[in-house]
Amino acid sequence: MSTQTKKVTRTIITSSSGGGGGGGGGRASYSSSGRFSGGGGRMRAGGVTSRRSVGSSYSAGGGGRVNAVMAAGVMASVGGPAGALQTLSDARMTRAHEKQELSHLNDRFASYIDKVRYLQERNSKLEAQIKIQESREAPNIKDLYEKELRDLRALVDELSNDKAQLEIERNNWQEQAEDYKMKWQDEAGLRSELEAEIERLKKELDAATMARLDLENKLSTAQEEIDFLKRVHDEEIRQLQDQLNESLTIVEVDSRAASTFAPGPDLTEALREIRTQYEELGRVNREDADVKYKQKFSELAHQRERDNEALMTARTEVTELRRNLNSLVAENEALKSKNHALEGSLAELEARMQLEIEEYQAAIRDLEQELETKTSEMAQQMQAYKMLMDTKMALDMEIAAYRKLLEGEEIRLFGESKEGVQQTSSSSSSSYQYSMKSGSGGGGGGSSSGKQQVTVSVSSGEEK
């Protein structure tokens, strides 16, 4: 029994991720070896990449030269030099065709793998961004918005309480203002009544003054009349006395003459009696005049005293009314000043309340606007997150589709390789291995993003 072996191995290794400071990076290698042995054939397909290097090695079972071993093996299998040359020519053509086909497949796989790696890297970056976004912003945004909402609700509650308190104070001030207004109206009505009473008393005072002046005039007139009557009475008495004296003188003369010429009654005695009668009559008249004068004077004096008393009473009432009027005027002025001050305080309070309400409303509007802005930003963040998730799902679906395409390419490659192997000589065996991996370069650190290997092996053997 004799065995001859020829082994061909092709390997493609590519790394697209990884780098370092020492000039490392990805590496790609492509090696090819052929193996001929007695036995069956097999093929295995894996992944390929874009960058490659090709190397070939041939080994014989005993470690001699490759060509001699190949020639000896071929000649032994075909039974002569001509058959061996034909077999070698067919094998070379088959290997060249396989090499060209595998190179084309390698390029196609490399493009697919590059796209898959790009999509995987992009998907990984998006997943990392999504995780970072979720871990960083989502809880913080939620807590931030919840805290802001709690603060805003607390502020709104506080503003509502302040507004209610201010409304209560405003209502109290309005009630006090209404009370003071009612009091002012009552005092104004009382003032009007007092002013009317004062006007009436002024009229009565004027009437009393006029009556007093009239009485004084009457008293003066009566006094003048009394004086005039007294003077007239005195003049009449004086005239009567003069007449009486003249009469007495004449009677005395006549009586003397008569006594001289003829004796008769005593005229002196008669004259004395007449004088006594006239004196008595004058006394009675004087007494009557004095009585009338005194009576009239007493009546006028009493009337004057009554008028003076009425005048004093009126003056006292006027003084009292003036004092009451001054007190009421002062109280009215005080109430007016107090009412004016209260109206000013009420207006100032209403203005301050209106200003505070406007400030609170502006703050509420700002907070609501900020809340709407934050809600809009949150909605935008959620929309962006949703778009990222949709992109991730689309990339996952695209990756799955490329994976299915790769699996289909593997199946197709496996079928084509199997058909190519069936066309080769039964004494030859070929093994092709494609591997794609990513790793770190020489000096720098790197990270491996994945490994995908396609191995195609075909073996056929013959033992003697």
Swiss-Prot record:
Superkingdom in the source lineage: Eukaryota
Keywords: Coiled coil, Cytoplasm, Intermediate filament
Location of this chain's protein in the cell: Cytoplasm
PROSITE patterns in alphabetical order: IF_ROD_1, IF_ROD_2
Annotated spans, Head: 1-101
InterPro entries: IF_conserved, IF_rod_dom, Intermediate_filament, Keratin_I
Chain residue ranges for the region called Tail: 414-464
Region (Disordered): 1-59, 415-464
Claim: Coiled coil is one of the keywords in the record: yes
Region called Coil 1B, residue ranges: 145-237
SS bond partners: none
Coil 2, as annotated region: 265-413
Gly residues bias locations: 17-27, 439-448
Coil 1A: annotated segments: 102-133
SMART domains the record matches: Filament
Keyword Coiled coil: yes
Coiled coil location: none
SUPFAM superfamilies: Intermediate filament protein, coiled coil region, Myosin rod fragments
Residue intervals of the IF rod domain: 98-413
Stretches with biased composition (Low complexity): 45-59, 420-438, 449-464
Region ranges (Linker 2): 238-264
Region (Linker 1): 134-144
One GO cellular component, as annotated: cytoplasm
Protein name, as recorded: Non-neuronal cytoplasmic intermediate filament protein
